[in-house]
Amino acid sequence: MTDLTQLEMIIEKAFDDRNSINTTTKGEILESVEHALNLLDKGEVRVVKRQKNGKWHVHQWLKKAVLLSFRLNPMQIMTGGVNGTSWWDKVPSKFSHWQEADFKKADFRSVPGAIVRHSAYIAPNVILMPSFVNLGAFVDEGTMVDTWATVGSCAQIGKHVHLSGGVGIGGVLEPLQANPTIIEDHCFIGARSEVVEGCIIREGSVLGMGVFIGKSTKIIDRTTGEIFIGEVPPYSVVVPGSLPGKPLPNGEIGPNLYCAVIVKRVDQKTREKTSINDLLRD
């Protein structure tokens, strides 16, 4: 197959002409999109890659490949459900046609009820409880995806992360300029928390239960008063909070507004030695 530079050029050109692409399109375009998705599925490429300066670079052409696949793939029966049940979809399971040898080679644990769509990469030593990992996502080694947690399209989950029960990590395919949601290495995301809209949780951070972070969420460091938007600094301990409401026109006190509060910041050694409960205890 073509090298990555040529593959990118083919997909970029096809995306510019996407209105003419449908389920009857074959040849170079179909082969290129399928190849790109297979590379994502194997972890040989990823939608977002961290650079040496700590910033994340988005490979938009890979997002475009995922979007083109929806135009190219027809709706069809997807097998593999419990007791022989099926689905009606355009995206096959990652585990379609897998045999025992494939699971052994991949070296992660997937318990009954875990759903992973093709083009999502799951690294060795990951544990997938009954959960959902969407296409284009990347889950790095040693991470736990707990029961009913969801990892959205193209989301990036780092090494040794714990996504607790019911956690939602938002996906993003459109608009194209939007960046995927990123959870960096060694983070703990508490039960029923949500991180969406391309926000970044930096390395070693702890989110308590029920923390919601989107692009409009104010993240306030109660020690310094500093306000962050869209990003939690490294080794932060974050809990839900609220901001005082502004007065209403009649002079009464207005409703409080939700925010996330950084209650403390810890260094790497403290984070490694201290239990999550102790970190969250104020």
UniProtKB/Swiss-Prot annotation:
- At the top level, the lineage of the source is Bacteria
Q: Which CDD domains match?
A: LbH_THP_succinylT
The record's GO CC annotations read: cytoplasm
Under catalytic activity, the entry for this protein gives:
(S)-2,3,4,5-tetrahydrodipicolinate + succinyl-CoA + H2O = (S)-2-succinylamino-6-oxoheptanedioate + CoA
What's a Gene Ontology MF term here? nucleotidyltransferase activity
Residues recorded as binding substrate, renumbered to this chain, are R109, D146
Question: Which cellular compartments is it found in?
Answer: Cytoplasm
Classification via InterPro entries: DapD_Trfase_Hexpep_rpt_fam (IPR005664), Hexapep (IPR001451), Hexapep_transf_CS (IPR018357), THP_succinylTrfase_dom1 (IPR023180), THP_succinylTrfase_N_sf (IPR037133), Trimer_LpxA-like_sf (IPR011004)
Q: List, in alphabetical order, the GO biological process terms annotated in this UniProt record.
A: diaminopimelate biosynthetic process; lysine biosynthetic process via diaminopimelate
The record's similarity note reads: Belongs to the transferase hexapeptide repeat family.
Q: What is this protein called?
A: 2,3,4,5-tetrahydropyridine-2,6-dicarboxylate N-succinyltransferase
Instruction: Say which species the protein is native to.
Output: Bartonella henselae (strain ATCC 49882 / DSM 28221 / CCUG 30454 / Houston 1)
- The primary gene name is dapD
